[in-house]
Amino acid sequence: MWGGYEVVTRVILNELLPEGAAIPANRGQLALLVWNNAGRPEPAAQPAFADVADADMAKAAQWCAEQGIMEAKSTDTFKPEGWTPKFNVIETWNKAFPKAA
């Protein structure tokens, strides 16, 4: 079962993500990947997550939360080191970059 999940999610992600992009392993990496591919837009508010020290990751997390692409864990925490299963990467990517019908 696990082997099938790994194969299927990797195939999907290799098709979805930009060429050469690593599959994000945590929430911070996923926020950065989405934000970078969206053109690094400025968030509406100053980054508010106390647990995100890196300036770019803080902007990415804030912007993703503002856009409803990713959820904050609380009003002031994002949990950037939190593990992100591959199916969540697929869901988040599809939410950020929906395919035209």
Where are these regions (language model features)?
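Feature responds to low-complexity, polar/acidic, surface-exposed segments characteristic
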Residues: 1-59, 66-87, 95-101
